[in-house]
C-alpha cells in the first residue's frame, strides 16, 4: 500500500522487506545500514511510510547525539508510527520534515530527546519519559507559521529517582519558535522544577500550571 513504499527516497524497498522482529537494524540483510548517528533515517522524497509494533534502541554511548529515528523528508510528506517504542538518551527522536503521527507510542531519553522542526507532529495517547535527573525534554525549533508539536491524551512521566528536569530547552532566538501544544495531557511536576528556558517571546505559559501533578 502507499504507506509502505520503502525507505530512503522510496528506492530501497528490499531493505524494508528484509526487516525481521528482533533484528539489529544497522545490520539488516547482512549489510551495514549505519554510517551515521541515526539508527533509522527517513529522508528526501520518502512519503507515507508506516511503522507498527517496532522498537528502536540506541546503542551509542550515553550523552552522545544519536537519534534512534531521524526524519528529514519533504515538508508535505508524511510518516506514521503506531505502538512503537523508542529508547535512547540524547536526541532520541528527530521528527522533522513534514507531517508525523505517533500513536500509542513510548519515548524515553534525557537530553532534547524530542526535537527538530517539522510542519506538524502529533503525539496521540503516548508516554514520554524522562530517565535522568537534571535532563531536559523538548527542543522544538519550529518555523513560526508551522503547527509544530501537539501532544493529545499523552502522559509525560519521570523515571524512579528523577527529582528535577526541564520540560523545554527552547528557541535560541534565531528565527525558530517553540510551537508546542498540550491537550488533555498529564505532566509530572518534576518537568517544571528546572524551569523553561526559551528566548521565544511569543510563548504562552501552560494553563493550569498549579494543577499539574
Question: For each of these PLM feature ranges, what is it?
Answer:
Residues 1-213:
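Sequence-level preference for short, compositionally simple segments enriched
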Amino acid at each position: 500500500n502507499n504507506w509502505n513504499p520503502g525507505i530512503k527516497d522510496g528506492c530501497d524497498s528490499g531493505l524494508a522487506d528484509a526487516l525481521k522482529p528482533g533484528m539489529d537494524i544497522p545490520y539488516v540483510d547482512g549489510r551495514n545500514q549505519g554510517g551515521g548517528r541515526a539508527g533509522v533515517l527517513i529522508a528526501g522524497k520518502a512519503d507515507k511510510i508506516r511503522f507498527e509494533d517496532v522498537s528502536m534502541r540506541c546503542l551509542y554511548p550515553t550523552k552522545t547525539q544519536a537519534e534512534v529515528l531521524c526524519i528529514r523528508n519533504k515538508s508535505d510528506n508524511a510518516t506514521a508510527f503506531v505502538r512503537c517504542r523508542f529508547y535512547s538518551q540524547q536526541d532520541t527522536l528527530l521528527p522533522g520534515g513534514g507531517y508525523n503521527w505517533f500513536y500509542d507510542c513510548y519515548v524515553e531519553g534525557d537530553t532534547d530527546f524530542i526535537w527538530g522542526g517539522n510542519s506538524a507532529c502529533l503525539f496521540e495517547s503516548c508516554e514520554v519519559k524522562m530517565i535522568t535527573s537534571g535532563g531536559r525534554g523538548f527542543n522544538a525549533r519550529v518555523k513560526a507559521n508551522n503547527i509544530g508539536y501537539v501532544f493529545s491524551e499523552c502522559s509525560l512521566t519521570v523515571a524512579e529517582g528523577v527529582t528535577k528536569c526541564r520540560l523545554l530547552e527552547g528557541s535560541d532566538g534565531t528565527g525558530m519558535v517553540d510551537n508546542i501544544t498540550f491537550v488533555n495531557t498529564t505532566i509530572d511536576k518534576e518537568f517544571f522544577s528546572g524551569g523553561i528556558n526559551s528566548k521565544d517571546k511569543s510563548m504562552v505559559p501552560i494553563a493550569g500550571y498549579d494543577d499539574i501533578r
